[in-house]
Structures are given as C-alpha cells and as structure tokens.
C-alpha cells in the first residue's frame, strides 16, 4: 500500500551538536533524560545515562563546560516561591544559632576560614597581621565590623561553602531522597572517568556554575523538585526557565524521552536563549522516526502490544494510514478477538472499545492493511506464573482461563511476517513478559527483529516502553529512549521539545 495523502510526517531534522561550534569555554546547558530505574538508592539500569555520553564528550572534548539538567521520577515538587522561603529559612537558621548572632557564628569557624573572610573585609589591612592560630584576635576584629558588612561577608562565605559550612543547605527545596540525582552523578563520573560536580538545588546553583572550568561537567539536582518545570502556567514555567537559562550560553537537548513535555527545561530555556540544537541521541531518535514516518523501505509493519486498546487508539488510528501489516499482541488483542466473535474466557477486554476494534479492522481492510491477531495463546486460570500453562489449539480461550502471552503458532506467524518486511516498528509487549512462562512471545519478537536487522538490513525501531526493555540486548536498528514521546510521535502528534529546536539547514 502507499501512504495516505493526509498521513503527514510530524517530525523534521534538526540542527545537531555537531553543527554548533566553537564550544570552547562556552557554558552548554544540556537537557538529558536520566530518568533511570532506581531501587534502594541504586541504579538498576543505566542505559539512559550511557546513551547521553557521546554528546557530553563532544562538549567537553571541544573545551566546553557541560551543565546537565534532568528529571527523575515524579516528586511532589514545590513552587519557586515556597522554595525561596525554604532557602531563606535555612540560611537564617544556619546564621543565627539560637539567636547568638553573626559574631557567634563567625567564632566557631576554623581559623583558616576566619582569615579568608577577614581578608575580604574593610579591616583586611589589620587582618594581614593576624594568624590562623587560636586567640589571635580574629573574632574581636570581626565583631567591630558594621552589621551590614558582617552579614554580607557571611552570606558570601555560606554561598561558597554550602557543603561544609551548611550541611542543612545541601539539599534542594522540594527534596525527596528517592528522587535525588546524586546517585546518577556518581555513576556518570564512573562512565566518563572524571569528576562530575553536583549542584544540590537547580535554581540556586549560580555560584557553583561560575566556578566551572573548561572540560568540567556538572549535574543539577532534579528539576522536578520545582513544580514550575511541568506547571500549567506558562509565565511560571518561563520564570523558572529564565533562572536556568542564565547559567548557560548554548542549549542542547538530548532528552527525547521528555520531548513530549512543554516544560521549563524542554521548551522554556531554548525560547529564552533564542536557539536550540539536538544532541547525538536526540538526533538519532529524530532521524529514525523521520524515516519510518516519512518514506520507509516497504513493506512496513507495526507490532503493537500492551494492556489496553484505549492507550493505543490514536497510535492505531494514525499508523493504519502508513503501514502494510499490523500485528497485535498483549492484552489489547483480546478486545479485537472478542470483537470478531471469539471466546476470550477471563482475559482482559475493554467492552467500551469493541466498536472501535470493529471499525479499525474494517478501515484497515479498506486500506488493504493486513491485520494479524493471535491464533493461539498461553493461558492460566490465575494471574501468576506456573510451570505448565495451558496452550490453546486456536483463537478461542477456554472458560475460566485468561491469556497471558501469545502462543507458539502465533509466534511462528509473527516471525514469518517480520521476515517479509523491510521496516518494522514495535510498541508494547506481547504478554506478561515479567513472568518467565509468559515472556516467550515478547522475546521472540525481539530476536526476530534483531536477526532481520543484522542479516538483511531490516530497519527496526523499538518505540520505547516495556518493549524497549525486552529488546535492549537484541540487535535492533534503534531502541528508542522515549516511552511517552515515541508513542505520541506514532500517534501523529508534534513533540514540543523537538519542534522548538533549530531546523537543519
């Protein structure tokens, strides 16, 4: 079949980090996607961190200063106003121990630190004759300074020595330990083989950023600790973006996984700086999706799985205009099978989507798109792993049983169809692949796509989500790092975080 006239390509090529030069001594704000799985403070899969390394190396090898921004998980987040109040409260508590005052705070500092502070004061000439030793007159000299000067000197000292002087300041406003990016900074340093500086508060990092030298890398704390990152109010998002934009000269986005967000860091910063380029990872994502949604080698098939038809309606509706084959698996397949009159036992079914399923099958037939549904199933009476699950003879599922994976006949048929195609895009697992007895279908698809890619040049794309986890080790052309972003592209939507970047000339 040919692509329908109204099946427009919703993504275009963008200027990349390779087009941005010189980067020497430039402060490069790089939005990355370090939203990695964590368990008990440990990273369980560092794929997204490793995927950003080439772009980071490009910046530092060119003598640039790399300042990384990312989110992690879904923290509650606080407003910037509340965050500023919290920071001021903590500064106040740090400066006035039990209301003893500035001189009392100064008095408990190490002698070397006292000398450094006095060297910046109006009494610096007198201070040159004072040693760091105990009882040499440092505190007495500080006590004679005007109150405003004391405050200014201590504020400067606190800003420059947060970690050591103010342990209570070494966490962000809105901080939630399980969502902190600190473990990511540690892993990134291991992968880069160099120190990675870590700013405890993304909106209070001006001093730390100003100290960075050529070739340095800094990771800012989770941008979602502030609610303005994904806030609905455009002015509030812009206010946050302005602070972050002030840290840098150049904006590069390598966060395809967050490209569907109209957020402070994805769209706000490049709008303020007036430019934006794609990192190598983003460039690769754009390139592959532009091909498969534009003029891919044919035949083109879409393999769609997952739990719910309702979550894939727009994808199915959009892709039917572009593809030659549609293979459906996962729990969503049972809604389509029931719509065709088959028995599905206790399997999941969205009754409200039966009419959509019938309509899609009819439209696909009219467009000469071949829709292939499971012809056998791996079943059990309960949603749990068992050593010997039931394998059905045909499409029908016995009463009292639920299908949890595609069966061996279906696997064979799907693998044969993959063998006919020159392009394939896959989104969603074929079964409950987290349970070993129901993982064969998903991993068989991954293996078939990998084999086709390596042996005959199949252009294969895994469109993010759980299927990406199953296929990472397979030899696929491209495993997308974007779950929601790739899904929205396949639904025919424009990604704000891509659209805002400069077009390739």
From Swiss-Prot:
Keywords: ATP-binding, Glycolysis, Kinase, Magnesium, Metal-binding, Nucleotide-binding, Transferase. CDP binds at residues 306, 311, 330, 428, 433. It catalyses: (2R)-3-phosphoglycerate + ATP = (2R)-3-phospho-glyceroyl phosphate + ADP. The keyword Disulfide bond does not apply. One of its GO terms (cellular component) is cytosol. Its cofactor is Mg(2+). It is an enzyme of class 2 (transferase). One of its GO terms (biological process) is glycolytic process. PROSITE patterns: PGLYCERATE_KINASE (PS00111). (2R)-3-phosphoglycerate binds at residues 32-35, 48, 70-71, 73-74, 224, 260-261, 308. Mg(2+) binds at residues 307, 311, 466. InterPro entries: Pgk_euglenozoa, Phosphoglycerate_kinase, Phosphoglycerate_kinase_CS, Phosphoglycerate_kinase_N, Phosphoglycerate_kinase_sf. ADP binds at residues 306-307, 312, 330, 403, 427, 433-434, 466-467. Transmembrane segments: none annotated. It comes from the Eukaryota. The keyword rRNA-binding does not apply. One of its GO terms (molecular function) is ADP binding. Its EC number is 2.7.2.3. AMP binds at residues 307-308, 312, 331, 403, 434. ATP binds at residues 307, 312, 331, 403, 434, 466-467. Pathway: Carbohydrate degradation; glycolysis; pyruvate from D-glyceraldehyde 3-phosphate: step 2/5. In T.brucei, three genes code for phosphoglycerate kinase isozymes, which are transported to different cell compartments. Monomer. Belongs to the phosphoglycerate kinase family. This is Phosphoglycerate kinase A. It comes from Trypanosoma brucei brucei.
